[in-house]
C-alpha cells in the first residue's frame, strides 16, 4: 500500500497509515504532484499551539515558555529543555549582536528577530536605544534600503503599486490588522540623502514605525508601513535582476496625483478620520504639494518638513542658554532649501512671531537660505519654486556658501543640503570669527552626507562651536576637554508627537502642536547636558521625553478644539505613560 486513507467513524476521523511508498505518505492535497498549471488550495490552520505558536512573532516567546505553557500548548519536544526569562534572552541577543562588526549584519539580525519574536525585539530596542537606534534607523537603514532587493526575506509592510490602480481599498483590506492608528508611507523617490530607491525604500516606513512603538509606545498592531510604487528613475535598479519593484520609469503629473488621491481616500474610508498618515521621503515637489493638499482634510504629518523643523527648533531653544539672547536676536543661514530647510525656517519664523507678536512675513527676514544656485534673493524670484519664494529677500546675488556667511554674518549655520563636506574649514573658521559661540547644525543623513563631522566643527572653531548633527558622531576630545555632540534626530519628536495625536483623538495637525513639541523637548535638557555642550537630552530617557511631548501635543489639540477623545484627562503625562505599549511577555493559559 502507498496511501493514507481517511475514514469517518461515528463522527470521528481515523487515519490508516500507509508507508509502502518509500516510507512516505500519500499527498492528500496534491501539493507534491502538482505542476505550475495545476491549482491547489493553500490550506492554513489558525490554532495558536505547537509549531504555529512558535512561528507567530506576536505570541512566540522562544525559550521563555514556562513548563506549564509547554504542556498546555503542545510545545514539548519543540524547544530545548531550558527555560530562560526575557532578561536572559535579551542579554544573550545583545552579546550576539555585538559580535557583528558590520552594521548591516546587525540590522539584518534585528529584522530577523522582529519577524520571529516581536516583544523581545521591542524589549531589546527600548532597553538599548542609544546603541541600537543607529542600527534600526539612520545611518544603517540607508544601506539596508540600497541593498533591500538582495537582503529581502519576507514582506514587512504593504506594497501598493500602479498594478493596484482602482483597487487600493481592496489592497488595504488585505492587511491582517484592522485597527490601524499610524501609517508611514513613502514613494521611495528621496530616501535619506541617497536619492531614488523606488520600492526598496520600504526600510524607511518599517524603521520609523518600529520607533513609534519602541520610543512612543504605539502598539505594533496599530502601525502600517506602506510603500507606494509608481516606478523608479534609478537606472541601476531598473537593470538590477534582484530589484523587487516595478520596472518602469516613475509616473508623474496627473497619473501620480490621481493614484495618491485614491490612496488617501481609501485610507480614510478603511481606517477613519483619526488615522495618522506620515509622509516620508517624498521628493520636494511632491512633499509640499501632498502636505498642502491633504492637511485640511486628513490627519497628515511630514516628518522631513515638520518633524525635522520641530526637533531643530527644540535644539535652538535649548541652545539659547549657552549662546544667550532670544531667538529673535539671532540670524540664521541655511545651506539647503528643500523640505527640511524651508520647513525648519518656517517653524523658526512662526516661533519668533509668537514670541515677538511680529508678523511672520517680518520674522522671515532674519532667515536666509542658500540653494544650488546661491543665496536666495529677490532678483531670483521669477525662477524660484513656490516653496522658496517666501525666503527671497532683498540682497545682491551671492553664489557660494562661504561668500554668504561673510555677507549675512549669521549666528546660526544650518545644513540640510544632503551634500557632504560642504561646511569647509574656511566656512567654520569664518563662523567662529563672527561669533564667540557659533551654533552649527550639520543635519544631512546618512553620516557620509553630513556637512561636516563633529571633530571638524570643534577643531576648526577651536572648541567654541555648539554642534549637533543629523547622524550620530562619537565624542570628541579637544585640548583636554571632552565634547559630546548632540544628534538632532527626528526620533526625539515624531514618536511622542504621534502618541499625543492618538491619545487625544486629534483630527488635524497644526503648527501650534509642533511648537508645543519643540518646547517640551527643549525643557528636557538638564544642566548636566549643558555642561557637556549638549542641546538635546540623552536617548536613554526617550520614553519619558516622548510622554512629555505627547502630553503637550494632546493639550494643544484639546485647546484648539481638534481632539475627539473626550473627556480630557487631568494628568496628560500619566495618561500618556499609561497608553504606552509594554513589550514584557504575557502568560498563556
Swiss-Prot record:
SUPFAM superfamilies: Aminoacid dehydrogenase-like, N-terminal domain (SSF53223), NAD(P)-binding Rossmann-fold domains (SSF51735). InterPro entries: Aminoacid_DH-like_N_sf (IPR046346), Malic_enzyme_CS (IPR015884), Malic_N_dom (IPR012301), Malic_N_dom_sf (IPR037062), Malic_NAD-bd (IPR012302), Malic_OxRdtase (IPR001891), NAD(P)-bd_dom_sf (IPR036291). Its cofactor is Mg(2+); Mn(2+). NADP(+) binds at residues 333-349. PROSITE patterns: MALIC_ENZYMES. NAD(+) binds at residues 190, 304, 445. One of its GO terms (biological process) is malate metabolic process. This is NADP-dependent malic enzyme. It comes from Phaseolus vulgaris. The gene is ME1.
Amino acid at each position: 500500500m502507498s496511501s493514507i486513507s481517511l475514514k469517518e467513524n461515528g463522527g470521528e476521523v481515523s487515519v490508516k497509515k500507509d508507508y509502502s511508498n518509500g516510507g512516505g505518505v500519500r499527498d492528500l492535497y496534491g501539493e507534491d504532484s502538482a505542476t505550475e498549471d495545476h491549482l491547489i488550495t493553500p490550506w492554513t490552520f489558525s490554532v495558536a499551539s505547537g509549531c504555529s505558536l512558535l512561528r507567530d512573532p506576536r505570541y512566540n516567546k522562544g525559550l521563555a515558555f514556562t513548563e506549564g505553557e509547554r504542556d498546555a500548548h503542545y510545545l514539548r519536544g519543540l524547544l530545548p529543555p531550558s527555560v530562560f526569562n526575557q532578561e536572559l534572552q535579551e542579554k544573550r541577543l545583545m552579546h550576539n549582536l555585538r559580535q557583528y562588526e558590520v552594521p548591516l549584519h546587525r540590522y539584518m539580525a534585528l529584522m530577523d528577530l522582529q519577524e520571529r519574536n516581536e516583544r523581545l525585539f521591542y524589549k531589546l530596542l527600548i532597553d538599548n536605544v542609544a546603541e541600537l537606534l543607529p542600527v534600526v534607523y539612520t545611518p544603517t537603514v540607508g544601506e539596508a534600503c540600497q541593498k533591500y532587493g538582495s537582503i529581502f526575506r519576507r514582506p514587512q509592510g504593504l506594497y501598493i503599486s500602479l498594478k493596484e490602480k482602482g483597487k487600493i481599498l481592496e489592497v488595504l483590506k488585505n492587511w491582517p490588522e484592522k485597527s490601524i492608528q499610524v501609517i508611514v508611507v513613502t514613494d521611495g523617490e528621496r530616501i535619506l540623502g541617497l536619492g531614488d530607491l523606488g520600492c526598496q525604500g520600504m526600510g524607511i516606513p518599517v524603521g520609523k514605525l518600529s520607533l513609534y512603538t519602541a520610543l512612543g509606545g504605539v502598539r505594533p498592531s496599530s502601525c502600517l508601513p506602506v510603500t507606494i510604487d509608481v516606478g523608479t528613475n534609478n537606472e541601476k535598479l531598473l537593470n538590477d535582476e534582484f530589484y523587487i519593484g516595478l520596472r518602469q520609469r516613475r509616473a508623474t503629473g496627473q497619473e501620480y496625483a490621481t493614484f495618491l488621491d485614491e490612496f488617501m481616500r481609501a485610507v480614510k474610508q478603511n481606517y477613519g478620520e483619526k488615522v495618522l498618515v506620515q509622509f516620508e521621503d517624498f521628493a520636494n515637489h511632491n512633499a509640499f504639494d501632498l502636505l498642502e493638499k491633504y492637511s485640511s482634510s486628513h490627519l497628515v504629518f511630514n516628518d522631513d518638513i515638520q518633524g525635522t523643523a520641530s526637533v531643530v527648533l527644540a535644539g535652538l531653544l535649548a541652545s539659547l542658554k549657552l549662546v544667550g539672547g532670544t531667538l529673535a536676536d539671532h540670524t540664521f543661514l541655511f545651506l539647503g532649501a528643500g523640505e527640511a530647510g524651508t520647513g525648519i525656517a518656517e517653524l523658526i519664523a512662526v516661533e519668533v512671531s509668537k514670541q515677538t507678536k511680529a508678523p511672520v512675513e517680518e520674522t522671515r527676514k532674519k532667515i536666509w537660505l542658500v540653494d544650488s544656485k546661491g543665496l536666495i534673493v529677490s532678483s531670483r524670484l521669477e525662477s524660484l519654486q513656490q516653496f522658496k519664494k517666501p525666503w527671497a529677500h532683498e540682497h545682491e546675488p551671492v553664489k557660494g556658501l562661504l561668500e554668504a556667511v561673510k555677507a549675512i554674518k549669521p549666528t546660526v549655520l544650518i545644513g540640510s543640503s544632503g551634500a557632504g563636506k560642504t561646511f569647509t574649514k574656511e566656512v567654520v573658521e569664518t563662523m567662529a570669527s563672527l561669533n564667540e559661540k557659533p551654533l552649527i547644525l550639520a543635519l544631512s543623513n546618512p553620516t557620509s552626507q553630513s556637512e561636516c563631522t563633529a571633530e571638524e566643527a570643534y577643531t576648526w572653531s577651536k572648541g567654541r562651536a555648539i554642534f549637533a548633527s543629523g547622524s550620530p558622531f562619537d565624542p570628541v576630545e579637544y585640548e583636554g576637554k571632552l565634547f559630546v555632540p548632540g544628534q538632532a534626530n527626528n526620533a526625539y519628536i515624531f514618536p511622542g508627537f504621534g502618541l499625543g495625536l492618538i491619545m487625544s483623538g486629534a483630527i488635524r495637525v497644526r503648527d501650534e502642536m509642533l511648537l508645543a513639541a519643540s518646547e517640551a523637548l527643549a525643557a528636557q535638557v538638564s544642566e548636566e547636558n549643558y555642561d557637556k555642550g549638549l542641546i538635546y537630552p540623552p536617548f536613554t530617557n526617550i520614553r519619558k521625553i516622548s510622554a512629555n511631548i505627547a502630553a503637550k501635543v494632546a493639550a494643544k489639540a484639546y485647546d484648539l478644539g481638534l481632539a475627539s477623545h473626550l473627556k480630557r484627562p487631568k494628568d496628560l503625562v500619566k495618561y500618556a505613560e499609561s497608553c504606552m505599549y509594554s513589550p514584557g511577555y504575557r502568560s498563556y493559559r
